[in-house]
Amino acid sequence: MSTLYEIAASLKGNQQTVVDAITCEAPILRDLPMEESSHGLWNIYESMKNVTGGDLVELDAPLPTVGVESELQQTDLSIIGGEMEVGEDTARKLGGPAAYFARKATPVLRKTGMSAERRVLYNGFREFAIKNNNVISAGGSSNANYTILCVHYVPGEITGVYDAEGFGDGKTFDLAPIAGGNLYKNAEGQLVYGMRLKTYFGLQLANPDYVSAIVNCDITNDTADSRTFPTAMMIDDLLVNAKAGQNTFIFCHPKVKSYLGSINKLDRLTIQNNHFSTQIDAWNGVPILTSFNFDNGTEETVEI
């Protein structure tokens, strides 16, 4: 499956700068596998409820009946975007609205990507795992928690969804001046120039067996006598609960990855070339990807 970054960068319109800005602080969003939606702004898919497969039988014995029970479901695409405004006088002092928006675009796009990724992590994967009881509690109870996610991307089941038609011009991210680039009066009665960014995006979560989570991971209060951070066995269970295989990833805050390495690697640590490191990049072959768009130890305790 192609990723969000690969698809956006390959389409016409030379949007490399826009794509780089949106994904530079959103590494998980950047590498999210994407599929075309079936009907533009929504995607119709078949959710498997029960599968009966074949079996070994004796020679000349009747073959068992095989089949699939399923139901049609729909994923609606959402909008990633926002609007920027600049006052007439400010725009004039700074070289005009085009120059102003070009200067401000990069930090705005960066923040847009960060916000979108956070929604994918919390309102998408984490909420899906909790809703389907595919979740483990590490024991934290002081509202100073982190989350660790395991996501197994599967075509048609666990994937991002995009509208291939975009806005009719083939662009994934559409930036356009408001009011045709002319002055207009905003809600406060001020004369301004405006610019808006829009793209259509969805997250298809069709199989609860492929998304798992560990919540209530408290680093601050974790001790040998009172564990509030996942044990090695819990991390193993996290992978099992997502049926970890190809295209499976562990997602967490960088501090979680660092602490996970320090408590699980010190007893096997080797020092080479005078470099001391407890960094781990994978757990039993599953890559660990980090993002600062996870909350930094401020999550409320989840009742399991």
Placement of each model-derived feature along the sequence:
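Core alpha/beta structural scaffold of self-assembling particle/tube/pore-forming proteins
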Residues: 2-26, 30, 36-46, 66-304
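Glycine-rich, compositionally biased intrinsically disordered regions
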Residues: 44-68
